[in-house]
Amino acid sequence: LEPPQRPALKAPTDYRIVGTPRHRLDVPAKVDGTAVYAVDVRLPGMLHAALMAAPVFGGRLESVESATAMARAGVKRVVELEQAVAVVAETHWQAQTALAALSPRFGTAGHESFTSAAWSDQQQQTLRTERGDNDHSVGDVDAALVEGSRRIEADYRVPYLYHATMEPMCATVRIADGRAEIWTGVQDPLQTRRRVAKVSGIDAERVTVHNHPSGGGFGRRMPLEGDYVEQATRIAMAMAPAPVKLMWSREQDVRHGFYRPAVSARFEGAVSAAGAPLAWRGRFTGRSEGAAARPLYGIPNQDIRSVPMQSHVPEGPWRSVAFSQHGFFVEAFFDELAEAAGVDPFEFRVANLGDRPRHRAV
């Protein structure tokens, strides 16, 4: 077929679906409780796994004495993983209570003294000593800072954040007859299939992903390296051909997430005697975040830089991505500039959105 050079678009008067209300097909099942989430999966002969990971990120399992757990009713096996230990039993409660009876020894990888507060202080100190990588520059910020009638500075910091999904991490995996199947709720089924294939050694074409609705995702249910999908796969390999459901406890879920990055930022700015913003200098820790770190407003002199810093704490996707941190940084400092200019923050914004009519309308 020859594609048309100028395809004719359907006239709005001929629309039959666009612009009409449509109800989600899954709403009734979610309302009446019949929707099947990953935690609801039940398979014939299914076993249950409970898991304890190293209390320090990066720590490895050194040893575990399994006899106490194995002596409990329903317990089938204690499975040792690189950075965790799991108990497999006939029911989740049996697995969880047997897990509590274990006293595994984990290494700390040298991170036992790490604290979020100390990491935040280190970020702030680094911002005072390092210039960083250029993200965005326009005009002459140094000259504008001298020229301004009032100059201000501000430091901001935001912590690691836990996704707090209503449904904890959960997956059921079956390895049998040269095939792998996984029942879970993820935001990237294809990457999940690749993860299961890599861990199990089974070709991806022989891996089936049964993707269920998830009880909250917000970026947390991306299949990340070393996460629950890989753990469930390794446990199922040890128990093949029986299907095994791994469900994290809430405590495990809080302690071993892939968190929104902790970020610190430092700003300098200046306003003119007429109350207009003249200069904006921003530095922040972490990778370049592009538009998220740039103010929307008409500031003639800007210098925005990122200072790469990375801790051992697992970081993952977060809903709204970098705007979660930088939206707060940018708008809070713009409020500070408005205060320095003696102008109402709303009026200050409207006055400096001249080339952004869409934003002015909002």
Where are these regions (language model features)?
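Structural alpha/beta core scaffold segments of enzyme domains
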Residues: 1-362
